[in-house]
Amino acid sequence: DVAEKWIAAMPATRLSVLLDEGGPVFCYSVSPQNAEWLKLPLDLQIRHMDAVSSLHTIVAANSDFAENPAQVFAAPLEYARSRGFEAAGTPWGTVLLVEVASVAQIKPYVEVWVPIK
């Protein structure tokens, strides 16, 4: 199965989320170099993300992140607007699962990029 090969290639591949025009979409991301090196099957829906100027931050996601992934883009988009920037592409992020020792649970954080102009 194609998805199993992408999952097996972690951490070179990453669970990601992008804020598409139709709403948030969970996906996997990989650099072109790693995709070639790992010979990952690319017969999926592929979106190439060009290198552009972006706002970059890490956001702590709420407990309902799996059901409401768009939440992680709200504050970075508002911050960009408040500084006079406009969105210039598809915001996206990679999901980081962090163990929080004080509460002994895994918490999702998302490293977010918001293309700006």
Q: Model-derived features: where do they sit?
A:
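A solvent-exposed interaction/effector surface
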Residues: D1-K117
